[in-house]
C-alpha cells in the first residue's frame, strides 16, 4: 500500500464532547501521523465551499448549519493506506450502523452529528487537504 495523505475533520459535536485527544490517539495507534492540524470555527462560506458537491442534496443546509455551529479540528493524516485506514477507524456514516470500537460508534450521536469527516478517495483527499492547508503548513514526519 502506498504512503498517502487524507483529510480528517473532528466535527463540532465531538469537539464539544472533549474527545479530540481520544480521537487523535486512535489515529496514532493505527500508525497514522498527524502532519498538519488546526482548530477553527468554519464560516458559512467555508462550509458551503467545502461541501459544494452536496449543494443540491436535501441535507446540504442542515450540514452547513451543523458544521458552523461550533469549532472543528482539521488535520492531515499521513501513512500507509491512510485514506482507507481512516475510513475504517471512523466507521459507518450512521453511528447506529457503525462497528463497535469505531470513532462514530463510540462518539457520534446521529447521522448528522457523526463526530468526524474523512476523505473518501485519493482525489477527494488531494482537494480537501488543499482546501484547508497550504503546502508550507504540512510538516512531513518521515
Curated annotation (Swiss-Prot):
GO terms for cellular component: cytoplasm. Keywords: ATP-binding, Cytoplasm, Kinase, Magnesium, Metal-binding, Nucleotide metabolism, Nucleotide-binding, Phosphoprotein, Transferase. It comes from the Bacteria. Its EC number is 2.7.4.6. Transmembrane segments: none annotated. One of its GO terms (molecular function) is ATP binding. It catalyses: a 2'-deoxyribonucleoside 5'-diphosphate + ATP = a 2'-deoxyribonucleoside 5'-triphosphate + ADP; a ribonucleoside 5'-diphosphate + ATP = a ribonucleoside 5'-triphosphate + ADP. The keyword Metal-binding applies. The keyword Cytoplasm applies. Gene3D superfamilies: Nucleoside diphosphate kinase-like domain. The active site is at residue 117. ATP binds at residues 11, 59, 87, 93, 104, 114. Its cofactor is Mg(2+). It is an enzyme of class 2 (transferase). SUPFAM superfamilies: Nucleoside diphosphate kinase, NDK. It is found in: Cytoplasm. InterPro entries: NDK-like_dom (IPR034907), NDK-like_dom_sf (IPR036850), Nucleoside_diP_kinase (IPR001564). This is Nucleoside diphosphate kinase. It comes from Marinobacter nauticus (strain ATCC 700491 / DSM 11845 / VT8) (Marinobacter aquaeolei).
